[in-house]
Amino acid sequence: MLISQRPTLSEEVLTDNRSQFVIEPLEPGFGYTLGNSLRRTLLSSIPGAAVTSIRIDGVLHEFTTVPGVKEDVTAIILNLKSLVVSSEEDEPVTMYLRKQGPGEVTAGDIVPPAGVTVHNPELHIATLNDKGKLEVELVVERGRGYVPAVQNRASGAEIGRIPVDSIYSPVLKVTYKVDATRVEQRTDFDKLILDVETKSSITPRDALASAGKTLVELFGLARELNVEAEGIEIGPSPAEADHIASFALPIDDLDLTVRSYNCLKREGVHTVGELVSRTESDLLDIRNFGQKSIDEVKVKLHQLGLSLKDSPPSFDPSQVAGYDVATGTWSTEAAYDDQDYAETEQL
């Protein structure tokens, strides 16, 4: 099995809806393979929500006007195509817009049901005069990609129901480039730089995660043909590699006090890997191994980026009684306690 170094992914947030992602190092040629796959998936396959049809009170078709409204129906529909919405519902939902003139009609005047959010309330929809009145019923559905109005035309729809083009994709723009990067003595590795811009209904980070999930599901179909087929195996991350190396360390390297060291040795715990497989209750069952010894072990493991099996991830060494984080030393009381234990052991 060929093992490749695990790439890292970093994000630089450029604006609220635009981020640049860097994936490196990639095996030669994989920058374009991964970049093109992610770009096409981001632009075409990210789920979203959009208006699929509208009904305007007193209007039978789009080629007409509404009394008291500056814009004709076609212009109103064009404005509604720019509406950015998100929906948690899998079924079609209905929103309502009711406004009496005079004044401007914006997306903020739309009343969405629970589970639906309008993300650009400042969007201009129409302008009303003193006698103007606008009542619109909007149907929102979830989907992906682009669906033309002709496909949104439902058979048997009531008179006055106007289908509109639906742009479901929440991703506006994706570009990528591949640069060369160095790994030790080799300079032919790829660095993929992906620039993603989205609508306000989704963050670039979530959009990229969605694209990655889709590709994993699809590529899994090929893997299922033979799960034992040989391929390039991705190696552990640097942090994982450090942990693996730390597991092999003898507990002598932890520089524990005499009490803690002897208790662990007597219990048959000889390496860090054997130590992190124990819980606090396991260690407390060891003779002469008390809470002070537990705290000491947790501090030493924390310095290696490790923890006991059941230790919470929020462990803070500065909260341990008798331990000075700044100097990395224990209080005199703890030292005397250990000295007393050593003398007792000798007796």
Curated annotation (Swiss-Prot):
Keyword Transcription recorded? yes
Any stretches that span the bilayer, and where are they?
Answer: none
The record's InterPro entries line, in alphabetical order, gives: DNA-dir_RNA_pol_insert, DNA-dir_RNA_pol_RpoA/D/Rpb3, DNA-dir_RpoA, RBP11-like, RNAP_asu_C, RNApol_insert_sf
Q: Does the keyword RNA-binding apply?
A: no
Q: Name one GO biological process term.
A: DNA-templated transcription
Coiled-coil residue windows: none
Give positions of region: Alpha N-terminal domain (alpha-NTD): 1-226
Taxonomically, the superkingdom here is Bacteria
Which keywords describe this protein according to UniProt? DNA-directed RNA polymerase, Nucleotidyltransferase, Transcription, Transferase
Q: Which Gene3D superfamilies does this UniProt record tie to the protein?
A: 5' to 3' exonuclease, C-terminal subdomain, DNA-directed RNA polymerase, insert domain, RNA polymerase, RBP11-like subunit
Q: Which GO terms describe its molecular function?
A: DNA binding; DNA-directed RNA polymerase activity; protein dimerization activity
Can you supply one Gene Ontology CC term for this chain's record?
A: DNA-directed RNA polymerase complex
Q: What's the Enzyme Commission number for this chain? A: 2.7.7.6
Recorded catalytic activity of this chain's protein: RNA(n) + a ribonucleoside 5'-triphosphate = RNA(n+1) + diphosphate
Q: Where is this region: Alpha C-terminal domain (alpha-CTD)?
A: 243-347
Q: What class of enzyme is it?
A: transferase
Q: Regarding domains, what does the record say?
A: The N-terminal domain is essential for RNAP assembly and basal transcription, whereas the C-terminal domain is involved in interaction with transcriptional regulators and with upstream promoter elements.
Assembly description: Homodimer. The RNAP catalytic core consists of 2 alpha, 1 beta, 1 beta' and 1 omega subunit. When a sigma factor is associated with the core the holoenzyme is formed, which can initiate transcription.
Similarity comment: family membership: Belongs to the RNA polymerase alpha chain family.
Biological role stated in the UniProt entry: DNA-dependent RNA polymerase catalyzes the transcription of DNA into RNA using the four ribonucleoside triphosphates as substrates.
**What is the protein's name according to its record?**
DNA-directed RNA polymerase subunit alpha
Q: What is the lineage of its organism?
A: Bacteria, Bacillati, Actinomycetota, Actinomycetes, Mycobacteriales
